Amino acid sequence: SGEIPLLEQLGATVYRGKAGQKFVFQMNDAEKAATRALQDRNLTVAMAQEADLLVLDEAGSAWELDMVDKDLLHRAVLRRPAGQECVLTAHAAPQWMLDAADYVTEMKCIRHPYQKGIAARKGVEY
């Protein structure tokens, strides 16, 4: 999330898809539904914008965890306007998504202070 202010300074429109501060496994059903509704709404709005670049951060996880309408995400990736490139940060993304994106990055955690119970710190994790 630390990249968001810079992207906004550069004129990018950033749609954030989290309705709270919890991880999905910590959410109750109502929180999951609210987050999914927000994800779907943001993706619908993003798809309606004219843009050269569509960045789908953690879209594979959203797909796997059923936190986004799968048909909507499928359309966003496979039926995007001609000339629009798709950037995907992929953790657990389905193969079709990996094949369709123009750029795919997977960050693999080998060690992180979170594993020792250290909370996210301003200026480091966000």
Where does each model-flagged region fall?
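Conserved P-loop
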Residues: 1-47
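Short, well-ordered alpha-helix to beta-strand connector turns
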Residues: 11, 50-51, 101
